[in-house]
Amino acid sequence: MNLFGKSNFNCVFSSSLDWFHSSRLSEKVGTKKNRICRETESFYALCLSHRRYLCYALEGLLPSRPRGRRASTYNCSDNLGYIRGLNGKQKQLIKKLVHICMIDGKKTRSRAIVYKTFHRLAPHGDVIKLLVNAIENVKPICEVKKVRISGTTRLVPSIIATNRQETLAIRWMLESAAKRRMGKKSISLDQCLYAEILEASQKMGIARKKRDDLHKLAEANRSFSHYRWW
């Protein structure tokens, strides 16, 4: 049998070529798996650091890594079940604060800012109570809209829903924190937000003044309230 014949040579060459391609493919798959594992580990470490901030701010406890079926829900950015003593409304309030603080879809960054703010508020008492008091002191009960009537633009006051009241209060506090930071790049946003929440809980600050100005404007234009059609 001639091993160096044309047919035998083609068979050996094709088998060696298949082995080469399969080995290269396995190397690529292994490299991709290692990269995904590294990215997953870094993401887990980042999430764990944020959870440490929040747990320290609210309870002073460190979270333990879940196993089994709960491991998939642990990586969810909106899961706050690891914090004891929070009801559904308080969890939704924290989520709303994170979502309104978010810019360009960078939720991890906004979550870090909020949790660092809680970390700074921890020495002053219950963080959730301070946040709720600040929102209660800032949220408006009415707003003013421009309505064109007989060729004239009127400012028509109207009562707003509770959900929008909370949204406006959080938005005003974040805007006030951003104003505090203007021209002072050495100060972080979480420091400014911490100062604004602390002042708002004491019925002071820029956001509280904005709420009072809006109420005065609505009081001055209450004679046009019957024009409200929405």
Curated annotation (Swiss-Prot):
It comes from the Eukaryota. NCBIfam families: rpsG_bact. The gene is RPS7. One of its GO terms (cellular component) is mitochondrial small ribosomal subunit. InterPro entries: Ribosomal_uS7 (IPR000235), Ribosomal_uS7_bac/org-type (IPR005717), Ribosomal_uS7_dom (IPR023798), Ribosomal_uS7_dom_sf (IPR036823), RPS7_plant (IPR034643). GO terms for biological process: translation. Transmembrane segments: none annotated. This is Small ribosomal subunit protein uS7m. It is found in: Mitochondrion.
